[in-house]
Every structure is written in structure tokens, then in C-alpha cells.
């Protein structure tokens, strides 16, 4: 799972303590055990990616029609809410990569048509908020909420000792938190370490 998926899980989990929550999510082969363990309802949508967007929008729209007491819709991507037809409150999360289309292009116009017509936009960082504003998104719709984490109740003693051993005497620490995915560009960070080492001889790079 990526950062946005984890963020949506955290939102769903927290909101389910106060509201009835229905989640429409992509199909995953091991979804049953997970879906049965959470405190909210999950409906999975499979099939080809090209058609999945339209099928998901249809299912969401039908669910809204049948459930008049719905208070709002939260989407993880502007494309996820593009085809949702409702006058209920709409909230859309944004991430820089997903909205970064040159101003005036067709994609940029689609992004603005969606985002400037939702009630609230949640940006995962100030950087993303500033980028959205420069691309034409209405600034007073945007709030910045940095992704949170679940506190760890018990830390493994072996892991703690390994971390202390690794970090001992290393005042300069470079840390990246992400999946080991090519598009995350870990290799560029590793390539930069040679130059950083000359400035910070004790630097240590940790990938989490």
C-alpha cells in the first residue's frame, strides 16, 4: 500500500468511530481477511483499470441515490470524484504528483473543474497546497493535513538495539519513508551520498 491508501485507511478507521462509513476500494486478492477485520463496510471493485473508474463511479452514485441520509463523500483523487453526481458535501485529497499538469492543458482544466467545485480540498503538504494554487485551484478551499501514523504500542527490543547501534555517533541522518519503488528515486539519493559524504562525513542514510 502507498501513502494515500494508508491515509484513506486512517481516515476511514477514525471516522468510523463517529459515523457509519462505506468504502469503495480496488480489488485485492487478499482483501477478505482485511475487510472482515475493520470497523467499516468495504465494497471492492475489480476489472480493467480503464473501466474500473466508471464502474466505481456508477456504484457510488447508486449507493448515494439509495441512501438519502449520507452526509458527504471523501475521495482520494480528483479522478475518483470527477463522475460523482451529488449535492452532498464533497471532500477531495490531493497529492502533488496527481495535480501537476501544465496550466492551460486539458488535464489541468479537468483538475480545476473538479477541485474548484468540491467543498473542501485536503492537501498532504504545504508544498502541494502552494502548487495547487499556482495551477489555478481556489486557495481558500485548501487545508493542509499532513499524513499521520498509528502510535506503536510496543517496540521490539531487538529492533531498538539495532537502530541504536546503527545511529550511534551519527549526528547527520538522512531518512526516506516510502515504498521501494523505482519512481520514488531512491537511487538518486544514493548517488548524491558521495557528495554529501564529503560535507557530512558521519552521514547515515536510512530507508524505511
Where are these regions (language model features)?
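Short His-centered aromatic/hydrophobic patch
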Residues: 74-80
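A short, basic/aromatic alpha-helical/loop segment that forms part
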Residues: 1, 181-186, 199
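N-terminal strand-loop element at the rim of the active site
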Residues: 1, 6-52
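Carbohydrate-associated surface elements
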Residues: 27, 127, 148
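Conserved donor-binding/catalytic core segment of Leloir-type glycosyltransferases
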Residues: 166-184, 190-193, 206
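Acidic anion/phosphate-binding donor-loop and adjacent secondary structure
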Residues: 102-105, 133, 148-165
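A short beta-strand/loop micro-motif in the catalytic core of glycosyltransferases
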Residues: 73-74, 117-125
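A short, histidine- and acid-enriched strand-loop-helix "catalytic/donor-clamping" loop
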Residues: 51, 80-82, 91-106, 117-120
Amino acid at each position: 500500500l502507498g501513502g494515500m491508501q494508508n491515509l484513506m485507511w486512517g481516515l476511514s478507521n477514525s471516522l468510523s468511530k463517529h459515523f457509519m462509513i462505506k468504502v469503495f476500494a480496488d480489488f485485492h486478492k487478499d482483501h477478505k481477511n482485511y475487510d472482515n477485520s475493520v470497523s467499516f463496510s468495504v465494497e471492492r471493485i475489480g476489472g480493467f483499470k480503464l473501466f474500473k473508474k466508471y464502474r466505481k463511479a456508477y456504484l457510488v452514485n447508486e449507493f448515494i441515490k439509495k441512501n438519502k441520509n449520507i452526509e458527504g463523500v471523501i475521495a482520494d483523487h480528483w479522478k475518483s470524484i470527477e463522475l460523482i453526481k451529488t449535492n452532498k458535501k464533497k471532500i477531495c485529497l490531493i497529492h502533488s504528483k496527481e495535480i501537476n499538469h501544465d496550466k492551460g492543458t486539458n488535464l489541468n482544466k479537468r483538475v480545476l473543474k473538479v477541485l474548484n467545485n468540491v467543498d473542501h480540498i485536503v492537501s498532504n503538504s504545504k508544498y502541494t497546497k502552494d502548487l495547487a494554487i499556482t495551477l489555478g485551484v481556489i486557495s481558500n478551499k485548501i487545508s493542509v493535513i499532513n499524513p499521520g501514523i498509528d502510535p506503536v504500542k510496543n517496540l521490539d527490543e531487538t529492533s531498538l538495539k539495532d537502530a541504536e547501534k546503527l545511529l550511534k555517533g551519527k549526528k547527520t541522518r538522512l531518512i526516506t519513508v516510502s515504498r521501494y519503488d523505482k519512481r520514488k528515486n531512491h537511487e538518486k539519493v544514493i548517488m548524491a551520498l558521495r557528495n554529501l559524504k564529503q560535507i557530512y562525513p558521519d552521514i547515515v542514510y536510512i530507508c524505511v
